[in-house]
């Protein structure tokens, strides 16, 4: 009898211990869920690999925790800053990699689709983009843990995990298409694009094709002096390249004028990478321009000039945000300052060099932020003759930028008219792909 009582007591104690452990784990899991975000997901590769980075690099873990703490001081509101501890970041990473781009952050906070995507994309970078005193002498693009290895490399793994979801059929439903059809910013009612029947994932929609050439008519198709825009985008301006191949990157400023990154010099050699080293000197004393694609733009890019392809290659890099993210307290929005130069040289990018009657031209599509995959049409190879307006490639989801380099003798001049300045606009109007972008005034 005593033995039976002992066994019963022991069994009850075991159940109590197991229940206590289960409750503790449930509480810990709940603590990892950012306020306002419901997550019923298990551990994913995104958070598992990040946790390993933290365990194996205790010094970096301290810096990450400091970055999160610094962010919580700048914006303590959990509605717009739900992650305020490292444990909460683990949960947030798991949550985001199976999310649609417009619902990572609480939807009621923002109005337009573009703003929802923008804030959702920028948020995780903002957490890791806080300037830290300990990193100021590390010669990073910006003294934040975003650019510190192994986090810099981990970001690509995180982004690829999300890309796998956006490539899958689970990322596309009729309700998503209906929602996008109702949003006028996408212009899906104008007959510009292929049939929606061709879209079986979000990325197939995002990299949608035109229905026909008339959707984006080519400006002056028989006049090779006219350079057309490579993409639907916002031109950011023109920069002169000096005799040593360097161009001056202006200081990066917030909208209130506060400088968040000092001016720097960047070289053509850095931008073209090692595969393009033999062509770099052609662009010394040349001209650079770049143009920004927003989320709701058509995300295929086309040749801006006619000629013969000399080289085509990719430069694999990490998926950094494409500038510097800061919190605008007045607007209650995360803002990406990407109008300036220099960040393109630390991003994944492609490059196509084209020999034209006006000298060599380099077209450099640049991925920005999450899942900005740079892809070329398979038929584009050295020796291929191309006409301006021909399709060159496409981006998958994320922000994107197109850089163009021209030789000095080309006399390239930007001809796009002025527009309202603010946000991602540098003061030029939005242009459509294959619309006139500039002209060659030299020979």
Where are these regions (language model features)?
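Signal peptide processing junction and immediate N-terminal pro/mature segment
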Residues: 22-31
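Universal eukaryotic N-terminal targeting presequences
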Residues: 1-2, 26
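Contiguous, well-folded functional domains in the mature portion of proteins
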Residues: 30-443
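Bacterial N-terminal signal peptides
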Residues: 10-21
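Bacterial N-terminal signal peptides that target proteins for export
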Residues: 2-11
């Amino acid at each position: 009898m005593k033995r039976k009582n002992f066994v019963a007591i022991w069994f009850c104690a075991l159940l109590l211990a197991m229940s206590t452990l289960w409750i503790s784990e449930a509480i810990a899991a709940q603590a990892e869920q950012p306020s306002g975000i419901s997550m019923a997901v298990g551990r994913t590769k995104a958070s598992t690999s990040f946790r390993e980075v933290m365990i194996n690099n205790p010094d970096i873990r301290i810096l990450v925790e400091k970055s999160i703490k610094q962010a919580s001081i700048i914006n303590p509101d959990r509605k717009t800053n739900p992650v305020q501890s490292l444990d909460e970041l683990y949960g947030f990473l798991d949550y985001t990699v199976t999310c649609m781009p417009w619902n990572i952050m609480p939807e009621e906070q923002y109005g337009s689709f573009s703003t929802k995507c923008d804030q959702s994309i920028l948020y995780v970078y903002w957490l890791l983009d806080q300037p830290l005193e300990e990193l100021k002498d590390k010669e990073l693009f910006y003294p934040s843990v975003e650019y510190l290895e192994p986090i810099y490399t981990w970001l690509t793994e995180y982004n690829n995990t999300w890309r796998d979801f956006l490539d899958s059929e689970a990322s596309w439903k009729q309700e998503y298409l209906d929602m996008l059809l109702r949003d006028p910013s996408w212009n899906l009612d104008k007959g510009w694009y292929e049939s929606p029947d061709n879209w079986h994932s979000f990325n197939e929609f995002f990299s949608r094709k035109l229905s026909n050439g008339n959707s984006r008519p080519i400006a002056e198709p028989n006049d090779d002096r006219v350079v057309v825009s490579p993409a639907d985008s916002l031109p950011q301006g023109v920069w002169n390249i000096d005799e040593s191949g360097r161009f001056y990157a202006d200081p990066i400023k917030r909208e209130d004028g506060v400088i968040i990154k000092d001016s720097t010099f960047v070289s053509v050699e850095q931008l073209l990478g090692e595969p393009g080293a033999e062509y770099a000197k052609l662009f010394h004393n040349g001209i650079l321009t770049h143009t920004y694609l927003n989320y709701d733009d058509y995300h295929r890019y086309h040749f801006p000039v006619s000629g013969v392809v000399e080289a085509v290659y990719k430069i694999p890099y990490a998926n950094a945000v494409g500038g510097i993210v800061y919190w605008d307290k007045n607007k209650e929005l995360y803002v990406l300052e990407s109008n300036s130069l220099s960040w393109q040289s630390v991003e994944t990018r492609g490059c196509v060099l084209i020999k034209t009657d006006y000298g060599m031209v380099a077209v450099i599509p640049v991925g920005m932020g999450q899942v900005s995959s740079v892809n070329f049409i398979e038929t584009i190879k050295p020796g291929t003759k191309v006409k301006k307006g021909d399709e060159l490639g496409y981006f998958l989801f994320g922000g994107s930028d197109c850089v163009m380099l021209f030789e000095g003798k080309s006399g390239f001049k930007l001809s796009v008219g002025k527009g309202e300045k603010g946000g991602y606009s540098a003061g030029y109007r939005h242009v459509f792909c294959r619309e006139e972008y500039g002209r060659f005034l030299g020979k």
